[in-house]
Structures are given as structure tokens and as C-alpha cells.
């Protein structure tokens, strides 16, 4: 088996995690108490979904997941929610005090006390696997727990499981919408370790997803639940080929191989199509070509950056539902002819496609329509650098005055760590600039202005 362990850290990680596991259960017909009426091989078996769920002798299916937070309220919602019987109580780890939006608290003072317990639980899950493939790590980098404890856990996972791949689903701060004043600090400090310790990181950003909900689903005031359900569709599409037997399966390691040209350049954009409400879906049938085109629309991107400002290096298209390879090839050929979608000249093919015949499921009473086919795109584009440069500018404004720095130093950090992390990100911006302009004959002189 090729098992994956999911690790959900901090409020964002846990709430996205809830949406994901709810969707996985629906897709596999697993009830909230973990029973699965449709399962033929009770108590074991090598069904494809066993990559994400382990089975007990009593026929109960338990997610291979750990939820960690430094304060109890969010995890208590899982402990009392609809799916409380799904998880083993040991998998829900909560501390007593908050990281208070402070990276240093999450990474040094408070995170340090809980991290061994987490690694213990992860070790138990790993021992329960026959062929652990890697980790999916969910967190946000704006807060204290997701950024601080998230980085700490990633660093420790690198030590304990060096060769296993780590995929991150990371919520980055939005350009306009901010949830805390010190977001830029936490993000820069956290990205510093994401650079080193994740193999692929998918960037998500609340504002971009708000806009998609508002525009495509006609939700006037989207809640986090709306956002998370959309994100869970993306993550479900990515992991579908691990959980179902498909036509063109895509492994976790394949994402890495196909999307990451250089180790540091591993921050991905994601998009999902079709995002339509039930009343709209009633009137339109979406072909493979149409959903492929809309996945490439700049407005479909789940992070606020415009792919037209950069070039694509590689791109992974995961189709699910009623899709045949012939349609996919035609759709991809059309995309290649478009002038607005530019690939770097050193990567001429750039497309990796996966097809899974399991049609997308939707949460009952949710906002998304039930459709026959859907596509999820993960792309490596140089335009991602816009996300970083935005944060860096805000970081510099605050750090030039050393505003709020004493909170971090008081928790045992050194000022040198700020400048080290900031230099690392400056180097990353430079890396992206170079990748975008390699082998250029100088016919595009405006390449430098975008960054």
C-alpha cells in the first residue's frame, strides 16, 4: 500500500482538514461513525482507500490523520462535531494556551512542549503503514501555530522521515484581507522553513477563494465553510488517484517529479473547475475543453497572483469523472496554442495529466453543483513570486522600525533570524526572476518590472 498521513496544524489546517475528511467520507461511502457498508473486505484488505483510512478488526475506518493545535477550542469542535466518532481521540492533540499569532511561541516556547507528543502519534500512524508514501501537511502561515508549530513539525519530520515526500497545503496572507498585524513576520519566518522542508507547497489565499465563491457561486458573503469546501475539492482531486483505481493514476511523488524543476521552486498555484452553483449547472453541460479553459483562467487561481504576469514551468491536470484521454489531449493542444498562456522556453511540453473515473462528489446542502466531470490544476508558474514580494514589502515596512519584534525576541528568538529569513526570501524572488528569464534573447525587455 502507498499510505499518506495527513497532518492538520492550527485553526486553518484543522478547518480545512474537517472539510477534506467530510468529503473523503462521502466519496467512499464511509459513515460519520467510521462504518462502511459497501466495504467487501472487513478488517483489512488492500482497497485503494486504505491509503487514507486504516481499518480496525471491527470494520471501522479511521483516517490516517493528526490534528494539532496549541489551544483547545478548534479541536473541541472536532471532538463534539458530526465526525467525532471517526477519529481516534489520540489523533486530536490540543494544548492549553494559544500561540497568540506569534511564530516564536509556536516554534520555540509552547510548540516545543507539544511537538514530541505529535511526533509520537505520527510515529504510531507510520508504524501502522506498510509502505508510507509521504505526508500531507495543512497549515496557514499568517497565525502563530500554523507558522511556528508547522515549521517545527516539518523540520522534525525531515529528520525522522528524511526520504518521505511532504506536500504542503498552505494558506498565505491575502493582499487586502488581513487577520493579524504580524502576518508578514510569521509568513516570512515560516516560508524560510517551507523552502527547506517541503517538497511541494500549494499556495492558497482566502481573498482569491472569496472572490471565486462570490463570482462563481453567487454567495454574497462567503464564510470559511464555503471556502474550505472549495479547497477540499482541490485536495480531493489531487488525492483521488491515491484513493480510487483510475485510468491514469498520479502518485504523490509524481507531483514532485513533474512540477519541481529546481528544489527551491516548488510553490504551486491551484485552480479547480467547474465551480458552479446548482441552478447554473442545471442549464449547462460542461465539456472537457470548457473546464480545462476555465482552470487556466486567471480568476480561477486560488492565490492572488496573475499567471499572465509570469510563465508556466509545468502544470498538472487532474481530471475526474466522465473524461477520456482523447478529450484531454485535444483540450491540452488548444491550451498550448493560446498566446496568453506562456511556458518558459526551456520546458516545451509542460503538461502532466491524470484521469480518474470516479466523478466528483459534493457535500449535501453545500454550494457546489453535482457535475459529471471536473478538473483540478496544479501549476508551477513564475507569477507565484507576486505572493512573496507582497509579503516582503510589508515585512520590510514593519521591520525597518523593528515594530513588534520584541514579542518574538521575548519568546527566545534572535533578531538575526528575521534578517536570515528575509534574505532567504529575497534570494527566492531572485530565483524566480532568473527562472523566468533563462535563455531569453532579450526580446522581452520588461521581464524585470514584474517583480
UniProtKB/Swiss-Prot annotation:
Q: Which GO terms describe its cellular component?
A: cytoplasm; microtubule
Gene symbol?
Answer: TUBA
Binding residues annotated for Mg(2+), in chain numbering: 71
- List modified residues, type N6-acetyllysine: 40
For activity, the cofactor(s) needed are: Mg(2+)
Q: Where does GTP bind?
A: 11, 71, 144-145, 179, 206, 228
- What residues sit in the active site? 254
Protein name (record)? Tubulin alpha-2 chain
Q: What does this protein do?
A: Tubulin is the major constituent of microtubules, a cylinder consisting of laterally associated linear protofilaments composed of alpha- and beta-tubulin heterodimers. Microtubules grow by the addition of GTP-tubulin dimers to the microtubule end, where a stabilizing cap forms. Below the cap, tubulin dimers are in GDP-bound state, owing to GTPase activity of alpha-tubulin.
Instruction: State the compartments where it is located.
Output: Cytoplasm, Cytoskeleton
Quaternary data: Dimer of alpha and beta chains. A typical microtubule is a hollow water-filled tube with an outer diameter of 25 nm and an inner diameter of 15 nM. Alpha-beta heterodimers associate head-to-tail to form protofilaments running lengthwise along the microtubule wall with the beta-tubulin subunit facing the microtubule plus end conferring a structural polarity. Microtubules usually have 13 protofilaments but different protofilament numbers can be found in some organisms and specialized cells.
Species of the source: Oryza sativa subsp. japonica
Per the UniProt record, the site (Involved in polymerization) maps to 451
What processing steps or modifications follow its translation?
Answer: Undergoes a tyrosination/detyrosination cycle, the cyclic removal and re-addition of a C-terminal tyrosine residue by the enzymes tubulin tyrosine carboxypeptidase (TTCP) and tubulin tyrosine ligase (TTL), respectively. Acetylation of alpha chains at Lys-40 stabilizes microtubules and affects affinity and processivity of microtubule motors. This modification has a role in multiple cellular functions, ranging from cell motility, cell cycle progression or cell differentiation to intracellular trafficking and signaling.
Q: Which domain of life is it from?
A: Eukaryota
Family assignment from sequence similarity: Belongs to the tubulin family.
Q: Does the keyword Metal-binding apply?
A: yes
What's the catalysed reaction? GTP + H2O = GDP + phosphate + H(+)
**Main location group:** cytoplasm
- Pfam families for the chain: Tubulin (PF00091), Tubulin_C (PF03953)
* Keyword terms: Acetylation, Cytoplasm, Cytoskeleton, GTP-binding, Hydrolase, Magnesium, Metal-binding, Microtubule, Nucleotide-binding
Q: Which GO terms describe its biological process?
A: microtubule cytoskeleton organization; mitotic cell cycle
Q: Which InterPro entries match?
A: Alpha_tubulin, Tub_FtsZ_C, Tubulin, Tubulin/FtsZ-like_C, Tubulin/FtsZ_2-layer-sand-dom, Tubulin/FtsZ_GTPase_sf, Tubulin_C, Tubulin_CS
Keyword Phosphoprotein part of the UniProt annotation: no
